[in-house]
A protein has these predicted regions:
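Phosphate-handling active-site elements
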Residues: 48-55, 84-93
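DPxDG-like acidic metal-binding loop motif
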Residues: 62-89
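Glycine/Thr-rich phosphate-binding loops of Rossmann-like dinucleotide-binding domains
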Residues: 14, 70, 165-167
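N-terminal beta-alpha supersecondary unit
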Residues: 1-64
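Residues at secondary-structure transition points
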Residues: 30-38, 69-73, 77, 94
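Surface "functional belts" at beta-alpha junctions
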Residues: 22, 89-176
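Buried hydrophobic packing segments
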Residues: 43, 78-82, 99-100
C-alpha cells in the first residue's frame, strides 16, 4: 500500500511517501507559512523521486489539527484535490497523535502545542501501549494540574508548548 502523508499544521510543511511500512521519501520545508506556494511542488518532487504518480497512491494521510487554521485548510484542500478524481481514500491524522507516535519507551507523553495566552493544544498518551489518556483539546496550562499531579508514570512534555508545561510543572514528582 502506497501512502502519501501531508503535514501543514505548523510553520514547517512536510510530505512523506510510505510503501507498506517502509519510508520511501520525506521532505520538510521550514519556509514560514508559505504552504500555498510550496506544498504542491513538494508533493510533485516526492512522487517523481519515487517514480510514482497520484494514480499509484492508495491512501492519503493529512494532518487534521490542531494547528494553523490556514495551514490545515491548505493541506486538506490539496489532498482532497488529489484524492477526489480517483476516489482515493483519505485519513485524517491528529497533530498531537502523530507527535506522540514519534516517541517510545515507558511513561506518559503529554503533547503540547503553544496556543498562545498561556494555553496549549494538548493530549496525553501512554508510551508503552500508545493508548490515549487525554483527548485533543485547547487547555490553559494551569488546567493540566490534575492530570500532571496524578500521573503515576514518568511524564515527558513534547511539542512547541512543552517548555510552557515544563516551566509550570517541573517541581512535580515524575515530571522529566
Amino acid at each position: 500500500m502506497n501512502i502519501l502523508a501531508v503535514d501543514t499544521a505548523g510553520k514547517t510543511a512536510g510530505v512523506a511517501l510510505l510503501q507498506d511500512d517502509r519510508l520511501l521519501y520525506e521532505v520538510y520545508l521550514d519556509a514560514g507559512m508559505t504552504h500555498s506556494e510550496t506544498l504542491m511542488p513538494m508533493i510533485d518532487t516526492c512522487l517523481k523521486m519515487c517514480g510514482m504518480t497520484c494514480a499509484d497512491i492508495d491512501l492519503y494521510g493529512v494532518n487534521a489539527g490542531p494547528g494553523s487554521f490556514t495551514g490545515l485548510r491548505i493541506g486538506l484542500a490539496a489532498v482532497k484535490g488529489l484524492a477526489f478524481p480517483r476516489e482515493t481514500l483519505c485519513a485524517p491524522v491528529s497533530t498531537l497523535e502523530a507527535l506522540a507516535a514519534a516517541h517510545t519507551g515507558e511513561g506518559t507523553v503529554l503533547c503540547a502545542l503553544d496556543a498562545r495566552r498561556a494555553q496549549v493544544y494538548s493530549a496525553a498518551f501512554d508510551l508503552a501501549t500508545h493508548s490515549r489518556l487525554l483527548e485533543d483539546d485547547a487547555r490553559a496550562v494551569a488546567d493540566l494540574a490534575d492530570f500532571v499531579e496524578n500521573c503515576k508514570k514518568p511524564l515527558f512534555f513534547v511539542g512547541d508548548g512543552a517548555s510552557l508545561c515544563y516551566n509550570k510543572y517541573s517541581n512535580v514528582p515524575g515530571v522529566l
